[in-house]
Amino acid sequence: MPAEAMEATRQSPRFLWLYALAWAGGAIAYVPFLTILLPIRITAVAGTDNIRWLALITFSGAIAASVGNILFGWLSDRTGSRRGWIATGLALNVGLLLAMTVVVAPLALLGLILLWQLGLNMMLGPLSAWAGDCVPRVQMGLLGGLLAFAPAMGALAGVLITLPDLAGPNGRIMLVAALIVLCVAPALLFGRPLSVPVAVDPAAPVQARRPFIAMWLARLLVQIAEAALFAFLLIYFRSVQPGISEGFIARLFCVVLVAAVPIALAAGRWADRNRRPFLPLAIAAMLSGSGLVILSLSRSVDWAIGGYIVFGLATTVFLSLHSGQTLRVLPRSEHRGRDLGVFNLTNTVPSLIMPWLTLALVPSFGFACLFVLLALLAFTSATILSALPRT
């Protein structure tokens, strides 16, 4: 099909919105669970040994997630089916979440978490590849903007389940399970994507792999910074102002994620209209580094909040748009699920790197030194993206 015809053919807005809702369901599946519900559950079953078990479960879970995403993405490539894997992963994810309400031993909880991570990535791996099957290049910016709803929905779900008197510990897990089904099931039941031509590169020469590697590395560098702020945000703010509350930090985190949605949508649409897919990514990475520089220089809580807002908005926009534009640089369409699993390593590997990086720098040199290093990583990401071809 001629390039002009491919540019004129677009996926239906209905499918794009249903897909974005399903992707948000994926975020709801792990954000409130890993940040709120899992620590509570570990404390309930492990008592005073909760820190050691949380570290072990987090580390093991990251490895299981990395393996599972590649494995099930590859299997969905081989079978030529995405929906079946997504539906099976959804069922396993929900079932294993509910099973955690009856676990009473730390070792059993560890086993369930490993299985849950596999089930979660049985859903997420093929789900990410499904977008590559259905969304043409001309709409990848819009897709990335829509994906910005996912972290915001995950954060809002965390706020919802912690409302006073809404539900107990087990009830919160059940509520999360219900929200996942409500978000993912509509795409499986009613998502009927139009048959649109999706550009592919049949030979995948070495030149085609270079943008893939560049995009992978650029995301990894930004994700390391994001993972550090995600894990140590409260501790950092209390180093600036000791009396700051957990509730304030949670609200700040949520507001930033929600505010990033319209920015990501506007940037994604601009990238599509102007055929500049990588420019908004480079700008976002540069702004992310700028926010980290502000954080490194902050001596008051107001400056710290301002620096985090710049960093949080830019990073959320970057990660959302990057998820859409990644589909543009995959070398071979028949290995789309597997290759996206490789890209998913940029989401899990930082969780393995970041604790050691923080321990090496913060106790001796403070958070300012850590933020300077993270800013250099973000600026390097921007430089890498700036060197990519215009389209």
Ranges and model annotations:
Residues L38, M122-V135, V317-P331:
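Intracellular juxtamembrane helix-capping segments at the cytosolic ends
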Residues E334-P363:
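A late C-terminal transmembrane helix in Major Facilitator Superfamily
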Residues G84-A99, L279-I294:
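Structural signature of the two symmetry-related core transmembrane helices
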Residues A65, G141-I161, N344-M354:
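Glycine-rich segments within core transmembrane alpha-helices of 12-TM secondary carriers
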